[in-house]
């Protein structure tokens, strides 16, 4: 019996379809070509959608996809997926960059050779019955300096291959320290040095506000005369109009593009330049790559739907596979603390302050914050909030979220503190994990306690007077509620005190009403963790 339906669009390789079919729990629905109108009609029944680059997964489509849980992009680029809208709708977006790494790197190398030796132009004239040997004199790559901008999977593979060919490779990546000693022997430099020293420059960065028009008239002016440029990453990183002028002037001796700012593009004036070569976005277009990315993304989607396992996510703060088991106790602690504190509060939520201390800072805190916010918002929104859209939903509802990191506190190697403020009250709870890996609440509203939060609990505050606990026990006994554990805290003798009682069975509202009638009881409520 199939539990999930997944739409496969844009000609996804059949190898991926087989991956989904093999689960026996997912029905793959394949539409290599489908009209927009038809897609908007059928997407409402889909739990997952897998696309290549043609289908626009935009706000309109997402608004029609009532039960959509995940969008998979077979490949790297997600220009056709509205990440912001997907996040707002609580839809996970993932891609499969690894499957096309080798193929795209090889395509870049092919373009590099073609650019250096004028291969496409020479081929074209020969097919036009011209033997123009002297016209297409090229340059050697050996000994030349290649500047690689972006050292992700593809950029690193291009750099490795070009080193093996005898090129001097220098690289710039905004996320790698220029002083880093890389095992590959790559020389890390600033982007300005790449501009000044490289004979060839290839870009391998995503298209963002920071990288758009990264190479423009100003940066080209800093380059060597006769520099050659390659873009097999995303259109728009190299300004096409500025490149056109640089080719005409001879400042840039040649350029090779596999991508354009607008695609498909057969009318670009760049295509009229003799020293410009291009391919129609073929970087990942090999039999092997299409099969691999199809298998990868379908496996990722299946694992998410069937096992709630996340990898390759683009709008979700995931844990690395090796971190999941190691930090699971912190995930458990965060979940229980949030579940506990939200049941203490009344009124409309206004702000959430989360403080992480000590060892917990070693993990992905965005992931923990999403877990905490989901638990805090769930009682109000029910099915409307998940780990993917929790931060967005909080912001949308005007809830201020503050996250801070501090060193380890005295007596605790790790500590998570959540302070929840509403329009009527404020509560703060802190918890830790000891060597036994069990989550413990160690402070509630400034009162020191030590309790493993689990199951049914009664939380009450009282004036610290004799007889309160005895009367409480009597009422619970009369109502057949068995106490499994009791944890007390007080500010001073005779002052305010609080208690947490772990009980073996659910507590009815009428029992709590009786407890509230006890002399010196200030407040009482049931909490279930």
Tell me what each language-model feature is.
Residues 105-124, 144, 163-167, 295-308, ...:
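Oxidoreductase and adenylate-handling cofactor-binding alpha/beta cores
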Residues 151-152:
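Glycine-rich Rossmann-fold phosphate-binding loop(s) that bind the pyrophosphate
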Residues 318-529:
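A conserved regulatory-domain signal marking ACT and ACT-like small-molecule sensing domains
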Residues 31-32, 52, 74-75, 90-102, ...:
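Short beta->alpha connector loops at strand-helix junctions that form conserved
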Residues 1-94, 216:
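An N-terminal-biased, well-structured beta-alpha scaffold segment characteristic
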Residues 89, 93-94, 226-344, 361, ...:
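Rossmann-like dinucleotide-binding domain for NAD(H)/NADP(H)
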Residues 89, 97-145, 157-160, 164-165, ...:
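Phosphate-binding beta-alpha-beta segment of Rossmann-like dinucleotide-binding domains, i.e.
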Residues 57-62, 174-269:
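Rossmann-like adenosine-cofactor binding region
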């Amino acid at each position: 019996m199939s539990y999930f339906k997944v739409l496969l669009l844009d000609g996804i390789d059949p190898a991926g379809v087989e991956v989904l079919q093999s689960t026996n729990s997912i029905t793959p629905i394949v539409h290599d070509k489908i009209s927009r109108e038809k897609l908007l009609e059928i997407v409402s029944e889909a739990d997952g959608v897998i696309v290549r680059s043609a289908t626009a997964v935009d706000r309109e489509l997402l608004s029609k996809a009532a039960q959509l849980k995940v969008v998979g992009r077979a490949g790297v680029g997600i220009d056709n997926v509205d990440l912001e809208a997907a996040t707002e709708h609580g839809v996970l977006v993932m891609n499969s960059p690894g499957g096309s790494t080798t193929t795209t790197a090889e395509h870049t190398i092919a373009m590099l050779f073609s650019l250096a030796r004028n291969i496409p132009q020479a081929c074209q004239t020969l097919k036009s019955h011209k033997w123009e040997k002297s016209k297409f004199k090229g340059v050697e790559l050996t000994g030349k300096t290649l500047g690689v901008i972006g050292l992700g999977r593809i950029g690193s593979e291009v750099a490795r291959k070009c080193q093996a060919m005898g090129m001097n490779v220098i690289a710039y990546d905004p996320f790698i320290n220029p002083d880093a000693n890389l095992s590959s022997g790559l020389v890390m430099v600033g982007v300005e040095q790449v501009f000044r020293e490289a004979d060839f420059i290839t870009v391998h960065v995503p298209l963002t506000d920071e990288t758009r028009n990264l190479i423009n008239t100003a940066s080209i002016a800093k380059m060597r005369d006769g520099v050659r440029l390659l873009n097999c990453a995303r259109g728009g990183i190299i300004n096409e109009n500025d490149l056109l002028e640089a080719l005409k002037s001879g400042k840039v001796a040649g350029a090779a593009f596999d991508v354009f700012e607008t695609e498909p593009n057969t009318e670009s004036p760049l295509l009229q330049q003799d020293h410009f070569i291009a391919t129609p976005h073929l970087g990942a277009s090999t039999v092997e790559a299409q099969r691999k990315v199809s298998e990868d993304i379908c496996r990722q989607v299946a694992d998410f739907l069937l096992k709630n396992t996340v990898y390759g996510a683009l709008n979700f703060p995931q844990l690395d596979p090796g971190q999941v088991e190691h930090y699971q106790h912190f995930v458990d602690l965060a979940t229980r603390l949030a579940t506990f504190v939200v049941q203490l509060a009344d009124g409309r939520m206004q702000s959430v302050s989360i403080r992480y201390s000590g060892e917990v800072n070693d993990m992905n805190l965005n992931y923990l914050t999403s877990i905490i916010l989901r638990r805090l918002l769930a009682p109000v929104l029910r099915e409307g909030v998940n780990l993917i859209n929790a931060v967005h939903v909080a912001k949308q509802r005007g809830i201020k979220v503050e996250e801070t990191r501090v060193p380890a506190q005295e007596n605790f190697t790790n500590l998570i503190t959540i302070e929840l403020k509403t329009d009527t009250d404020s509560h703060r709870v802190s918890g830790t994990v000891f060597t036994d890996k069990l989550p413990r609440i160690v402070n509630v509203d400034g009162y020191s306690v030590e309790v493993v939060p689990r199951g049914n609990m009664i939380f009450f505050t009282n004036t610290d007077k004799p007889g309160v606990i005895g009367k409480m026990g009597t009422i619970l006994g009369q109502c057949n509620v068995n106490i499994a554990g009791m944890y007390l805290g007080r500010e001073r003798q005779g002052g305010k005190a609080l208690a947490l009682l772990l009980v073996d069975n659910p507590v009815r509202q009428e029992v709590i009403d009786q407890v509230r009638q006890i002399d010196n009881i200030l407040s009482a409520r049931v909490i279930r963790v």
